[in-house]
């Protein structure tokens, strides 16, 4: 991958500045030629409000949700954005203060209330945020913006108007759900969230939302739990951001980053903690990998174990003969990476940003190979017999299977993150190419393509340019896996540049096809999708 680039001007700080929403779409200035087959909308979520009055938000995942849209039609591009009218946002705007506790920011009681009313207000229970700043996904004919709690927010993908809040707890037994559901080609949605299982111990439920049926009823009302994974700790679930899915299997990676529920329920209610205060690391458990039979809806009790890492994003998971291939964006060690994503750290001058990143867990793209058929007679042997990987799986005398990965990409403080693939055709299947956002000491400064078979890489990078997660859009007449384009929102605060633009790259070699520039800044976005017309 590319050599390390320096950012002494600190232009990345523009990613974390408050912006205003738009009353109507802006016409973007296009250079290059946008493919005429590219028609539809790029929808993205991220924070757009980093303070309320004089009260700042402290963490990257705290700012109020802003929904962005780039529309493509006949070679022209428009840009629009609206704040999502969540309860967190509406109440903050009404009361001119932070009302609901966010990921790393505490909401304090109304200063107008006396001490007694403030005290009793703490006992109304934990007020969970609905700040849907992480992702957007389809359910039936509808679209929902989400964070990682039990609340998702229905939005209009054309006007960007907020329609309604939905509480998943009204339909299934989960305390929350990830912002990375899997969407099958027929519209079936799978997700995972922790729950209270037998004897009040914690477990993880897989939620299935069916596709839209002939009766046109809301598919969410037909949600069901299809399988349950056990938890390594009865009262401390692991933080889960994504999971793996193939036609026949579900893969859940349980990391040592734990949520202390006692702290969540007591400290939060009584002393005003936030989500970040409730995380802790189990320094001895390592990582447990779990699998379930998707079609039979049955947990498979194979005890896969490996050394500790943080995990946020699965790249892809697929079946290869009697093995599961699990490709992950890992961060080495048990310390929580989110400890390094406070806005004060991310807004530091470049030398301080680098100093902070050197203390953090280091990134690595890894492939784990999970054998499905375990024969006790093979104790002490490597069960991986595939010829095309160096990953191993050793059956131990205690019946655990110790996994060592094949490293697909590693660079000191150079992460390949926010991965995307040709998901519609290759999700859950053997594949060759992954696209990622390159993080340089946590600063997004390049786009990458990785051949997971040969480990060859391609890079797009320009000075003072800070891209977002790459979104792959397949050519309608594609013959090969990487026939298409890659879309990314780039913030470009350098002298002589427009503040931001939508970048279109050839997915084959990451060469520029076109860009659509706008005259306003666009803050950081996390995840999104391309909605075809």
Swiss-Prot record:
It is a lipid-anchor. This is Retinoid isomerohydrolase. Interacts with MYO7A; this mediates light-dependent intracellular transport of RPE65. It comes from the Eukaryota. Its cofactor is Fe(2+). It comes from Bos taurus. The modification N-acetylserine is found at residue 2. Keywords: Acetylation, Cell membrane, Cytoplasm, Endoplasmic reticulum, Hydrolase, Iron, Isomerase, Lipid metabolism, Lipoprotein, Membrane, Metal-binding, Microsome, Palmitate, Phosphoprotein, Sensory transduction, Vision. Palmitoylation by LRAT regulates ligand binding specificity; the palmitoylated form (membrane form) specifically binds all-trans-retinyl-palmitate, while the soluble unpalmitoylated form binds all-trans-retinol (vitamin A). Its main location: cytoplasm. InterPro entries: Carotenoid_Oase. Belongs to the carotenoid oxygenase family.
């Amino acid at each position: 991958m590319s050599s390390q680039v320096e950012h002494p001007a600190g232009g990345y700080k523009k990613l974390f500045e408050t912006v205003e929403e738009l009353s109507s779409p802006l016409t973007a200035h296009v250079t290059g030629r946008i493919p005429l087959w590219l028609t539809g909308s790029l929808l993205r979520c991220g924070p757009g409000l980093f303070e309320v009055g004089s009260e700042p938000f402290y963490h990257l995942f705290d700012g109020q949700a802003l929904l962005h849209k780039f529309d493509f039609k006949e070679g022209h591009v428009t840009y629009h954005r609206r704040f999502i009218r969540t309860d967190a946002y509406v109440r903050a705007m009404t009361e001119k203060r932070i009302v609901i506790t966010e990921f790393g920011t505490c909401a304090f009681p109304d200063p107008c209330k006396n001490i007694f009313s403030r005290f009793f207000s703490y006992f109304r229970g934990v007020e969970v945020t609905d700040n849907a700043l992480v992702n957007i996904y389809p359910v039936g004919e509808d679209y929902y913006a989400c964070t990682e709690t039990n609340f998702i927010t229905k939005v209009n993908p054309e006007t960007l108007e907020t329609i309604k809040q939905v509480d998943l707890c009204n339909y299934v037994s989960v305390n929350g759900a990830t912002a990375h559901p899997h969407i099958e080609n027929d519209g079936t949605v799978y997700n995972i969230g922790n729950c209270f299982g037998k004897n009040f111990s914690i477990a993880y439920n897989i939620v299935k939302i069916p596709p839209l049926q002939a009766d046109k009823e809301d598919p969410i009302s037909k949600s069901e739990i299809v399988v349950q994974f056990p938890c390594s700790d009865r009262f401390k679930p692991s933080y889960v951001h994504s999971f793996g899915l193939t036609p026949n299997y579900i893969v859940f990676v349980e990391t040592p980053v734990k949520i202390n529920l006692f702290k969540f329920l007591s400290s939060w209610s009584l002393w005003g903690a936030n989500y970040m205060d409730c995380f802790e690391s189990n320094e001895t458990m390592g990582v447990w990998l779990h699998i379930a039979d998707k079609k039979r809806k049955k947990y498979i009790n194979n005890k896969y174990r490996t050394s500790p890492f943080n995990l946020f994003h699965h790249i892809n998971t697929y079946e290869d003969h009697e093995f599961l291939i699990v490709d992950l964006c890992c961060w080495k060690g048990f310390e929580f990476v989110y400890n390094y994503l406070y806005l004060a750290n991310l807004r530091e001058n470049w030398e301080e940003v680098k100093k902070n990143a050197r203390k953090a867990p280091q990134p690595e793209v890894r492939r784990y190979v999970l054998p499905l058929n375990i024969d006790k007679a093979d104790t002490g042997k490597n069960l991986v017999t595939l010829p095309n990987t160096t990953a191993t799986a050793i059956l131990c005398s205690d019946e655990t299977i110790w996994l060592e990965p094949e490293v697909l990409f590693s660079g000191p403080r150079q992460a390949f993150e926010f991965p995307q693939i040709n998901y519609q055709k290759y999700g859950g299947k053997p594949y060759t190419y992954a696209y990622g956002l390159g993080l340089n000491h946590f600063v997004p400064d390049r786009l990458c393509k990785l051949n997971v078979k040969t480990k060859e890489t391609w890079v797009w990078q320009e000075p003072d340019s800070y891209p977002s997660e790459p979104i792959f859009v397949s050519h309608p007449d594609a013959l090969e896996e990487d026939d298409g384009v890659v879309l990314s929102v780039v913030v470009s605060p350098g002298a002589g540049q427009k503040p931001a633009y939508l970048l279109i790259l050839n997915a084959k070699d990451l060469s520029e096809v076109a860009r659509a520039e706008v005259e306003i800044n666009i803050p950081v976005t996390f995840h999104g999708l391309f909605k075809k017309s």
